[in-house]
Structure formats: structure tokens, C-alpha cells
């Protein structure tokens, strides 16, 4: 940040009365804190795909009403790091209750969405046939039609 930007921030921490009338569409009620605490963002899974796009996967175990905001924060962080790569986002719901989260955010000046899937929609047989033990373990969370088959494959 340049010294000019810092000086302007200091000046406008308390915006002059007349300028506020010009810039603000409605009179200012109160001044709010200008700093935002920074938190380290960490996604569950991030990879570059063969087509040069970036795939982001989040696993979520409960219905979080703030999930669209979290996914937007992740999207912006990924976009900042990989600005020339298309970004594909997927939320995989692994909770016990019915999936009720929204996968989009619609505000006056912003529209944002991502893909979402309930892991129970995935046929467990695909994962059970994998040589990777983690795939087989995750199969327990997927759609299970034959529990005996599932148990045999896990043992």
C-alpha cells in the first residue's frame, strides 16, 4: 500500500461532513470500524485439473446457513492466487440430516453460486471397487442399497 493510500485512509477515517453528503446516498448514522480481522483461509481440497482449471472441494457435515459466504471467500482467495484459471467449486455434504443449504448468493450487486452434492447421491459401489482404502471408507457415507455387499467389501 502506498503512503498516499495510508494518508487517505487516515484522513477519511472520519469523512468530512460535506463530502459525506455528496458520496453517501443517505445521511450517515454512525461511523463503523474500518479494520477487518484477518483469518487464515484453508480449503479442504484444491487441485489444478488437466484443462488448467482449479477444482475446489469443501466437505460439510452440517447445514450451515452461512456456507454461501464462506464459499465466496474461498472463491475470491483462489481467484486472487490463480487469476487466469477458471475455478470450479463443489460442496460435498456428508451430514446425517437432509441437505438444506443454499448453493447461491443473490445480493443487489452480486450473484454467486457453486455446485453442491449430497454424498448419499453417489453410488457406493463405485468407491467400493477402488484400490484406495479411503475411497472404500467413504463408501459408508454414500447411497447403500446392499449393506451386506458393503460390509463384505470393507472387510
Where are these regions (language model features)?
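Elongated, amphipathic alpha-helical interaction scaffolds
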Residues: 1-155
Amino acid at each position: 500500500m502506498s503512503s498516499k493510500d495510508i494518508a487517505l485512509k487516515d484522513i477519511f477515517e472520519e469523512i468530512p461532513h460535506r463530502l459525506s453528503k455528496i458520496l453517501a446516498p443517505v445521511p450517515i448514522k454512525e461511523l463503523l470500524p474500518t479494520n477487518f480481522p484477518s483469518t487464515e483461509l484453508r480449503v479442504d481440497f484444491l487441485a489444478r485439473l488437466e484443462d488448467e482449471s482449479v477444482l475446489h472441494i469443501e466437505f460439510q457435515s452440517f447445514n450451515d446457513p452461512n456456507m454461501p459466504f464462506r464459499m465466496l471467500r474461498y472463491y475470491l482467495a483462489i481467484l486472487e492466487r490463480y487469476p487466469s484459471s477458471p475455478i470450479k467449486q463443489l460442496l460435498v455434504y456428508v451430514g446425517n440430516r437432509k441437505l438444506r443449504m443454499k448453493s447461491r448468493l443473490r445480493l443487489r450487486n452480486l450473484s454467486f453460486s457453486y455446485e453442491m452434492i449430497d454424498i448419499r447421491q453417489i453410488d457406493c459401489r463405485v468407491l467400493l471397487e477402488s484400490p484406495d482404502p479411503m475411497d472404500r471408507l467413504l463408501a459408508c457415507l454414500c447411497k447403500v442399497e446392499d449393506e451386506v455387499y458393503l460390509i463384505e467389501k470393507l472387510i
